[in-house]
A protein has these predicted regions:
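Class I SAM-dependent methyltransferase SAM/SAH-binding core
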Residues: 466-509
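A conserved beta-strand element that flanks and buttresses the S-adenosyl-L-methionine
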Residues: 521
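Phosphate-bearing ligand-interacting subdomains
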Residues: 34-98
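A short glycine-rich, Lys/Arg-flanked "PGG" loop and its adjoining helix->strand segment in the class I
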Residues: 533-545
Length: 611
């Protein structure tokens, strides 16, 4: 292998270059310390600049020294007319290459959203699958919390209206063909309607029906479900026609019906609802313990059961149950559709990822999530199942010839809970304090002071982390009222200032009504939002007209300057300015916000005045 490189700097930084360039390609080190001449680093000879000067033009020279000496050596080489790169140049190129090689994760999300846009019916409902393109009440129902979570409030409202419009007089809902009522389907619809009811309460969500009418419909639906409950706690659905055989699905999935009833019990102070939930839970835990512990159903339906246990607080039982699928994933690389096959149900795999994320198991969650993402079709959808080419005799018989609507929903949920689990895991690494002289903080403080309203103002820090900015602002701009929102309550627990209101939320689902805040800012958080336009729309929704939205984040032109997360994105200055301009009358950009004493254009500030 030809030796084509010379490293300038025979110290720590010079040695670190060997992470990026094979030693076989390095001719020698060069150093200004003449005492190092004739020594070696990692078996590579070291020469003094004085003795090596005339040969340097024959090689690619890379400067690898601390910032203290970097300018001096650049000047030295420039004077000799010797071209060079720096260690940072090499690092940046390596990170850029790594980013270019990673899967197109953001594209997976964008294609999934395009699939939803293409496969809903007039904005009223989601289809069953591409082979049966009719509205599916059950899935339309449990799409609603997902749409709200990702900031698609109008579509969620439209879905909710359609579901109330088609509710039967007895409170039930029927299947896709409008043939039979189902306890399970009705409960999934209630998940959506309860999510709307809670959003009305928290955010003033605009809905076609009055709160009174919505409350009436929700309670009527729950009363119908509970009318199918036996004294022992069993829920008996009027029809099981769509369930398939007992190997595929059984009534233990009724555990997945209980969460909306729990939420309704709180909303309406219905102790009788909670008492019946407790009885139903105990019945299915006792009657179906073998199926629960030993992966007794199709992974999609099995995951309904285990996620329900997590949501109902039965985490120990859920962890015990997941040992079976954990073992299978270790053996064949993914969770199979059934415990004794080698093909995969895409929805079940995303659901398994969700369960692991909710239990804080990122390792298994990420493995399941990545495998399921790889099954996405170019359309943005997923087939119900995919064959395993290593087992050609096995037939994947779960909707293998159509893209099913529910997989897209569970992909979006898995991505949300992945982000939440990631931030919980990283809690210890977040900054709790910033110097008052940090350029990013100075921009926030200056913009806030410029916009201070007589009598005080409401300020939102969204993606607040440990509240480092708020901590400083309480001292520097004490006349404002501060609110903190973050996806991780674990991270927010570090905010100890009692005057700060804290709520769990995300950039695409901020738990406040329209026009609540005078000044909204987010720093190094938009890069994690995935759906940037949805996040900007939400930032502007909760900010008053003529109020300020401030985004501080990284410039895409500097991509490669540091490692980034799988789902992270940096921003083209004009592109983000254009997105904000849809919701703001004017958007200013500061293209060089300093950080840690450095001003290199990595950070920008976009400042918008809301329409």
């Amino acid at each position: 292998m030809k030796k084509q490189y010379v490293f300038f700097g025979a110290g720590f930084w010079g040695q670190s270059l060997l992470q990026y360039i094979p030693r076989e390609q390095v001719a020698f080190y060069v150093d200004n310390n003449e005492q190092k001449d004739g020594t070696a680093v990692e078996g590579i000879p070291v020469r003094s600049f004085k003795n090596a000067r005339d040969e340097l033009r024959n090689y690619k020279v890379i400067i690898a020294v601390s910032n203290q000496y970097l300018f001096e050596i650049k000047k030295q080489l420039d004077a000799e007319g010797i071209p060079y790169e720096t260690l940072q140049d090499v690092k940046t190129a390596a990170v850029k290459e790594k980013i270019a090689r990673r899967p197109d994760y953001l594209g997976i999300y964008q294609r999934a959203m395009q699939w939803i846009n293409k496969n809903n019916i007039n904005g009223n409902c989601i289809i069953n699958n591409t082979r049966v393109p009719k509205g599916y009440p059950e899935v339309t129902g449990y799409y609603i919390p997902t749409l709200l979570r990702w900031g698609y409030r109008d579509l969620a409202a439209s879905f909710g209206k359609w579901l109330i419009d088609i509710q039967k007089p007895d409170g039930s809902w029927y299947d896709t063909e409008d043939k039979d009522p189902y306890v399970f389907d009705s409960a999934q619809i209630l998940k959506g309607l309860v999510a709307i009811r809670k959003s009305i309460q928290e955010t003033g969500f605009s809905f076609a029906y009055s709160e009174e009418e919505l409350d009436k419909r929700i309670q009527k639906g729950i009363d119908w479900i509970l009318s199918n409950m036996k004294k022992n706690g069993q829920l008996v659905t009027p029809s099981e026609a769509e369930w398939g055989d007992k190997r595929t699905c059984s009534e233990v999935i009724h555990l997945y019906c209980l969460q909306p009833i729990v939420e309704a019990a709180k909303l309406y102070n219905r102790l009788d609802y909670q008492e019946k939930v407790d009885k139903i839970l105990e019945y299915y835990k006792e009657k179906y313990i073998d199926d629960i512990l030993h992966f007794g159903l199709l992974s999609h339906f099995y995951s309904y059961v285990i996620e329900a246990l997590v949501d109902l607080g039965e985490t120990d039982l859920a962890r015990k149950a997941m040992k079976t699928t954990e073992k299978l994933m270790g053996e064949i690389g993914f969770v199979p559709a059934y415990r004794d096959v080698h093909w995969c149900c895409s929805t079940g795999l995303f659901q398994q990822a969700i369960i692991w994320y909710k239990l804080g198991d990122l390792e298994h969650g990420d493995k399941a999530f990545a495998y399921a993402c790889g099954m996405q079709n170019a359309s943005g959808g997923w087939y119900g199942s995919d064959a395993n080419p290593n087992y050609p005799d096995e037939v994947n018989d779960y909707i293998s010839d159509a893209e099913v609507s529910w997989t897209v929903k569970y992909f979006l949920d898995a991505l949300y809970f992945k982000n939440k689990a990631d931030f919980n895991a990283q809690a210890s690494g977040f900054e709790q304090e910033y110097p008052h002289t940090d350029g990013r903080y100075e921009v926030v403080k200056a913009e806030l002071k410029e916009n201070v309203i007589a009598g005080g103002m409401n300020v939102l820090d969204i993606g607040c982390g440990k509240g480092a900015y708020i901590h400083n602002l309480l001292k520097d701009v004490p006349e404002a009222k501060y609110t903190a929102v973050d996806i991780s309550t674990k991270v927010m627990s570090f905010i100890q200032d009692e005057v700060v209101e804290k709520k769990e939320g995300s950039l695409t689902e901020i738990p406040y009504p329209n026009d609540t805040f005078d000044f909204t800012y987010t720093t190094e958080a938009l890069e994690h939002a995935v759906d940037i336009e949805s996040a900007v729309r939400e930032l502007c929704r909760v900010t008053k007209s003529d109020g300020t939205v401030l985004v501080i984040d990284k410039n895409k032109s500097h991509l490669g300057q540091m490692e980034i997360c799988e789902w992270e994105q940096w921003f083209d200055v004009k592109e983000l300015q254009g997105i904000m301009s849809k919701y703001c009358t004017k958007v200013r950009v500061n293209q060089n916000v300093s950080y840690n004493g450095v001003s290199d254009g990595l950070f920008c500030a976009w400042i918008g005045t809301v329409k």
